[in-house]
Amino acid sequence: MIIDKLYENVEKKGCVCVGLDTDISYLPKGFLNKFTNIEDAIFAFNQRIVDSTFDVSACYKVQIAYYEAMGIKGMILYKKTLEYIRKKGGIVIADIKRGDISATAKMYAKAHFEGDFESDFITLNPYMGMDTLEPYKDYFKNKEKGVFLLLRTSNEGSKDIQYLDLKDNKKVYNKVGEKIENIGKEFLGNCGYSSIGAVVGCTAEENNIRKELKHTFFLIPGYGAQGGKAEVAKSYLSEGNGGIVNSSRGILLAYKKYDEEGKNFEECARNEVINMKKTLQII
């Protein structure tokens, strides 16, 4: 199962997930000026980030919105970025946050687990109900695919719904977590984790999530630019595994800390990943 490959990558390379939420404003001006169009510039930037971090990162997360906003040319860029990572043997998470009834979900599954936009994992929103997961299950069983379901997200507005109190002294996200854990047991890999994972932001603490969701692998966003703390992120791991900690802007814009002109932006990105790994190990 794909979750075993991800688990092995974390064991070998560490738990950092590099987010390719690449905006044109992130590119150093000197680098951007070498290109005649935006799409080629962003793709070359993505390539150099991937190449420089490949041996020290568990996987990559590509946020589709940054590419959709560029229209058809942006979606071609998105396709090329996914392909580049996968052809190198890397694992890529398509951050698409889809969620819909079964007939529509079937098309989403086909769109993002096959063809032009094929990825290894995708993110889904389960708050329409767990029946929205049905069309994806064949891909878990037979086609080496997985998902991360939004459980408790890193944005401030997550408290509007996810944190609502229920009658049994639990919150909405606790109940959703129970469902994710139970459904996931059908798709366990040899590593003991399921190909159905959960998104758990590290901008707020919740010590019981890791204990309660023993078989659920976590995608942990919010580190760095969103204010998530390393000690919180590490609390969601189990002996350094069981999750991946994502950083996007913190890695892509790391050059601004050391090299404002960005002549060595990929080296700065690599150093940021290595520093993240060290911080998460030490705390």
UniProtKB/Swiss-Prot annotation:
The gene is pyrF. Belongs to the OMP decarboxylase family. Type 2 subfamily. Pathway: Pyrimidine metabolism; UMP biosynthesis via de novo pathway; UMP from orotate: step 2/2. This is Orotidine 5'-phosphate decarboxylase. It holds the Pfam family OMPdecase. GO terms for biological process: 'de novo' pyrimidine nucleobase biosynthetic process; 'de novo' UMP biosynthetic process. It is an enzyme of class 4 (lyase). Transmembrane segments: none annotated. The keyword Metal-binding does not apply.
